[in-house]
Amino acid sequence: MKALLSILTMVFCLSLSGQQYLTRQGTLTFDAGSPLEDIRATSNSATAVYDGKDGKLGVQVLMTSFEFRRALMQEHFNENYVESEVYPKAVFKGEFKDDRAIGTLDIHGVSQDVNVPATLVKENDAVRLKASFAVTIEDFGVAIPRAVANKIDPQAKITVDCTLQAR
């Protein structure tokens, strides 16, 4: 009986470690504000997938899904900065390993290798992914006009908070 219980426990643990997780309602925020201007936006429709078997992790967000406190900011963001008609989404592809998200981040058609602190915590039948890091806006080919350069922080702070459900 003990042997059977041990085998069932091992099989159950192995099935959890090989589980795939998904959300289409992840939260991503960015803050590129300065003392002169509050420039923050949030998207609650990020897609994230995680494979518990091999640690593969992917996150993507439509640029038009970011909501600003003022409609004009949102319009300028999509038309003048990220050019969301040409570059509709930001995508991270990589893996979760040793409390790090390691991979490639593609924004505005430019890919950069990233290695950022992240947590992945099991919560019932889900896992919660959290990360907070900064990116240099110009590293992704997004030009900041001189006329507004003092209003925009060249380092955008990105926060990721996604609860992924088992598939």
Feature locations, PLM:
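Bacterial N-terminal signal peptides
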Residues: 6-15
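Low-complexity, acidic/polar, glycine-enriched regions of mature
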Residues: 18-167
